[in-house]
């Protein structure tokens, strides 16, 4: 008597639910031990999948020999639950062993990887080995010999995978945030035990027969269409392709969906949903035995399903940008819906076809119950082996070597070629069904890979981080597309991330679609994250910095005279190239022998090293990104405290944007649970830096004045903050230690390794306009909690308050309290022709000669003394090539002024053209500089060599304004560049076609009534 397939399938649903939760929790837990590097994650995934594959192969054979396979299944589920319940203890043992070993910094990558494999095997081996045997055992319990297509196997496979979908969604969106890792794991253990009990009960009531007569020939004369070995190889290849493609999906969807834990869970859930529904569809609709031709067409269809979203390219990115508005309507649920729509388009079709493939391969091996356990086990083992190879090949080789888009192309071509090979096998077996369709679809898939595919608009525009503009018209959209593609100066796919340099108005390095720092505009945070701890510590000798980035934090910290060693911990090797490009603002960090860069995970380093530091500065990426929140946990701060010398400081960056008050309270609560004394500084309108210590933070005013007058503090404070005095420095204190403790008392939770609540809090507010800087400063001011508790000595508090008032209002003051306000105020005077600007410009010249020149040039231009203005401006523009520290607003005004001063005089235009012909330091104002350069060139030689060179320098992404497009078309036509002229005219026609027609044409005004 066979068991009801649907009853057994319900058990498999719960089994899949538990297995996915186990996998999710174990990966998160191992990330806390080994770190989040590709090497570490790859080792854990390899053991997890290898355990499944080996267990499937070995236990599948045993399932065929069992008289009561459902009882065998129940036993497997029981011991899986036991092994999972023991895993927290085994993880603790693994952590102690790994931390004692010194990790990858001491052992090296090769030895550390071997140790990770061993420890992962210790923790995961028993459970995953047993998991591998569950599907063969369950299939043995439901299959009958009259099931020629093995639809029962497909049903179990599909429903098991749908259970995994439920596990992925519930764990990601509910359980991990609510219960934490450990309790989520034990909930799954409880469900697993219930499954074991129910399965055992079902086995007692209705045992399946395994007698020899069950395998007697039914008289149909059926023989396998192909030998076993080709089927196993095919199973391996599709496993390789799908896992490789899964890595590409994660890498490519992160820029448009945000890279949060929610995104990764959603991609996994959609992929599993497709597989599950594909398996169920095979079970419900497949009639008759499987054929090689059927497998061939699934491969070609999967290739097309993968290639089609690639061919859509930036259209999908634009769709994702448009769908962001769903978040404004439906809140977080609207965001999830928008992510789901994009993910379904990209992932679901290929996953659905992959779900059909596996049961089809099982059906190619045999029919009914005969050897079903062994064949499922072997096919699954080969499939898992291919998946392991695909995962390792993608993470360690193909994506960094070829880039993610090229790997996307490769997967589609590989599947198309596999389809063609399957057609040949089918032809030899004289099975010609689907051959023509397979070839046509496969060729279409390969053809689709020749499309441009995703460009910088998809990969680097910040759509997922809510940084991309939302165009309202067709021309605004085209302007966005051209601008985004034009400003990307450099890009690489690294081992861990995709990295690019966006040269809009600065050297901004973009990681997985979001800017993680700009050389000049983020210098107020990056430089001072390196210097704040050094200002308070009397003689810092050793420091550790989490995250290399532009190198500014590391470089300025290393410039402190007493500093002997600065260890910079960076996860992505490609970022070292970024740091080298930013040396003009980083005090030549990468050339300083004091700086030692380690490519590793920061948690791993802190937990395995025995070094002690005077300062630890942590400036990772945003906590909403998967895995980053573990650098903001109580355990991370405890490890930091253990690594600090007495009197040492932790300097922690916190974003002040896209954050709600509850999340900020949690951060305060977490930091103060380890460091009772926390001083909050505002470094820029969007950034906070917490200076934390186990001892009271003492700020002696006389010592402070001496300290900030010394180098590198004097230059660092001036360049980044425009701070010249102790009063201006203290004005940067947003809140004192009492405020931090008061906020901590209201924290809704503590961010821990087990429950990283800020990860989810930040992810829910990723598209929010919420900021906390103003709230913190106003509340601290009203509660008199904005003066450092440990302040000793006299300060001019009126000057402190004047600086704070300006910082909150962001408006020029009548009596400028600092150089930044003075520059803004004086520039405004110059633009209005106010001669008082000369007096302030003379004062500014002592510390800000470039700002002074630009302001005077502005005044002279306003006074119609254009030759004097041009000369002053020329000097400033040439100096900008090597000086990265000008005031950004004044600099922009100077570049804009060059265009106005150059008009009417080819000589002035040529002078300014020559001054702007080279990029400024760290590519400041690069996009605008190139645009103004075209304008100046046209004033010099209207479509001559200079104009032509300036226009061609931005091809094929012109500035999308009518004047620029018209000039471009004219110059190409006049120089006989027919192909370029034709394209330029097409672009101009497109611009005009998308420009609304005026109600009244300006060239033809109507005749007034009554005129003759």
Q: What is each stretch, according to the model?
A:
Residues 967, 971-974, 978-1012:
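Terminal, low-structured helical/coil segments at or just beyond the last alpha-helical repeat
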Residues 829, 860, 898-901, 937-940, ...:
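Residue at a conserved register position within TPR or TPR-like alpha-solenoid repeats
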Residues 701-805:
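SAM/dcSAM-binding transferase cores
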Residues 821-824, 855, 893-896, 930-935, ...:
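"A position-specific structural signal for the A-helix of alpha-solenoid helical repeats
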Residues 850-855, 880-891, 920-931, 956-965, ...:
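Boundary/linker segments of alpha-helical solenoid repeat arrays
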Residues 1-706, 710-713, 762-768:
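Alpha-helical transmembrane segments of multi-pass membrane proteins
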Residues 807-811, 834-845, 867-880, 905-920, ...:
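Alpha-helical repeat scaffolds
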Residues 793-835, 855:
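Alpha-helical segment of the N-proximal tetratricopeptide repeat
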């Amino acid at each position: 008597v066979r068991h009801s397939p649907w009853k057994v399938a319900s058990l498999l649903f719960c089994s899949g639910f538990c297995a996915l939760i186990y996998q999710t929790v174990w990966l998160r837990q191992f990330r806390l031990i080994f770190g989040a590097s590709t090497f570490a994650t790859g080792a854990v995934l390899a053991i997890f999948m290898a355990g499944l594959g080996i267990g499937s192969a070995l236990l599948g054979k045993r399932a065929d020999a069992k008289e009561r396979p459902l009882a065998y299944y129940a036993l497997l589920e029981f011991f899986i639950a036991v092994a999972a319940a023991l895993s927290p203890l085994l993880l603790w043992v693994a952590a102690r062993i790994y931390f004692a070993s010194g990790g990858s910094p001491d052992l090296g990558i090769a030895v550390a990887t071997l140790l990770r494999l061993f420890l992962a095997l210790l923790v995961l081996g028993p459970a995953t080995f047993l998991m591998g045997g569950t599907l063969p055992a369950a299939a043995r319990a439901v299959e009958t010999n009259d099931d020629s297509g093995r639809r029962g196997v497909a049903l179990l496979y599909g429903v098991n995978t749908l259970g995994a979908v439920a596990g992925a969604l519930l764990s990601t969106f509910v359980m991990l945030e609510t219960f934490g890792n450990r309790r989520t794991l034990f909930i799954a253990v409880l469900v697993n035990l219930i499954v074991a009990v129910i399965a055992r009960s079902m086995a007692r009531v209705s045992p399946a027969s395994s007698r020899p007569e069950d395998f007697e020939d039914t008289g149909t004369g059926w023989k396998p269409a192909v030998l076993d070995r080709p089927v196993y190889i095919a199973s391996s290849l599709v496993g390789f392709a799908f896992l490789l493609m899964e890595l590409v999906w994660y890498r490519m969807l992160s820029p448009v969906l945000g890279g949060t834990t929610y995104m990764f869970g959603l991609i996994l859930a959609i992929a599993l949903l497709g597989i599950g529904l594909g398996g169920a569809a095979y079970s419900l609709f497949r009639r008759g035995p499987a054929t090689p031709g059927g497998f061939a067409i699934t491969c070609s269809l999967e290739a097309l399903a993968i290639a089609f979203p690639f061919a859509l390219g930036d259209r999908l990115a634009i769709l994702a940008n448009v769908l962001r508005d769903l978040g404004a309507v439906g809140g977080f649920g609207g965001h999830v819906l928008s992510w789901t729509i994009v993910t379904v388009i990209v992932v679901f079709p290929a996953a659905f076809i992959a779900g059909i493939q596996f049961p089809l391969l099982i059906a190619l091996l045999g029919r009914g119950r005969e050897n079903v356990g062994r064949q499922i086990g072997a096919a699954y083992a080969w499939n898992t082996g291919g998946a392991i190879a695909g995962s390792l090949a993608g993470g360690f080789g193909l994506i960094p070597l070829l880039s993610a888009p090229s790997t996307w192309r490769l997967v589609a071509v590989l599947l198309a070629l596999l389809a063609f090979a399957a057609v040949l096998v089918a032809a030899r077996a004289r099975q010609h069904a689907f051959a023509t369709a397979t070839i046509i679809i496969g060729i279409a898939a390969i053809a689709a890979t020749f499309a441009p595919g995703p460009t910088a608009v998809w990969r680097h525009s910040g759509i997922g981080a809510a940084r991309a503009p939302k165009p309202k018209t067709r021309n605004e959209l085209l302007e966005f597309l051209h601008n985004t593609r034009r400003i990307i100066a450099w890009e690489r796919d690294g081992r861990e991330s995709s990295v690019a340099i966006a040269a809009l108005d600065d050297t901004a390095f973009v990681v997985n679609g979001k800017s993680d720092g700009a050389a000049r505009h983020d210098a107020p945070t990056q430089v001072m994250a390196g210097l704040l701890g050094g200002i308070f510590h009397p003689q810092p000798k050793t420091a550790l910095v989490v995250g290399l980035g532009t190198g500014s934090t590391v470089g300025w910290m290393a410039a402190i005279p007493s500093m002997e060693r600065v260890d910079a911990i960076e996860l992505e090797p490609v970022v070292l190239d970024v740091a080298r490009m930013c040396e003009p603002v980083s005090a030549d960090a990468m050339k300083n022998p004091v700086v030692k860069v380690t490519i590793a995970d920061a948690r791993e380093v802190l937990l395995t090293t025995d070094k002690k530091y005077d300062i630890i500065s942590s400036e990772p990426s945003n906590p909403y990104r998967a895995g980053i929140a573990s650098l903001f946990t109580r355990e991370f701060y405890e490890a930091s405290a253990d690594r600090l010398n007495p009197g040492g400081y932790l300097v922690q960056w916190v974003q002040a944007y896209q954050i709600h008050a509850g999340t900020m309270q949690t951060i305060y609560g977490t930091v103060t649970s380890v460091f009772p004394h926390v001083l909050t500084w505002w470094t820029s309108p969007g950034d906070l830096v917490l200076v934390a210590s186990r001892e009271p933070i003492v700020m002696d005013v006389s010592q402070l004045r001496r300290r900030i007058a010394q180098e590198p503090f004097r230059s660092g404070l001036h360049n980044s903050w425009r701070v010249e005095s102790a009063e201006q420095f203290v004005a940067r204190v947003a809140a004192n230690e009492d405020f931090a403790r008061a906020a901590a008392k209201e924290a809704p939770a503590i961010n821990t390794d087990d429950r990283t609540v800020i990860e989810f809090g930040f992810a829910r507010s990723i598209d929010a306009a919420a900021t906390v800087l103003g709230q913190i400063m106003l509340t601290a001011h009203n509660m008199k909690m904005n003066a450092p508790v440990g302040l000793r000595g006299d300060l001019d508090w009126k000057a402190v308050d004047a600086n704070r008032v300006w910082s909150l209002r962001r408006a020029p003051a009548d009596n400028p309290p600092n150089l930044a306000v003075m520059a803004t105020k004086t520039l405004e005077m110059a633009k209005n022709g106010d001669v008082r600007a000369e007096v302030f410009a003379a004062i500014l010249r002592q510390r800000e000669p470039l700002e002074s020149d630009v302001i005077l040039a502005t005044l002279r231009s306003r006074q119609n003394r254009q030759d004097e203005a041009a000369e002053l401006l020329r000097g400033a523009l040439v100096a900008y090539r090597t000086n990265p520290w000008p005031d950004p607003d004044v600099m922009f005004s100077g570049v804009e002024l060059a265009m106005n001063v150059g008009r009417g005089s080819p000589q002035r235009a040529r002078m300014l053209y020559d001054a702007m012909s080279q990029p400024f330091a760290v590519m400041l104002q690069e996009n605008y500089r190139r645009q103004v350069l075209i304008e100046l060139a046209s004033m010099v030689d209207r479509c001559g060599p200079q104009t032509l060179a300036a226009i061609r320098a931005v091809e094929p992404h012109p500035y999308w304004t009518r004047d620029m497009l018209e000039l471009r078309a004219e110059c190409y036509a006049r120089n006989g560049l027919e192909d370029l002229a034709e394209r330029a005219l097409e672009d101009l026609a497109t611009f005009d076609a998308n420009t609304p027609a005026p109600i009244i044409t300006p060239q033809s005004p109507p005749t007034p009534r009554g005129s003759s």
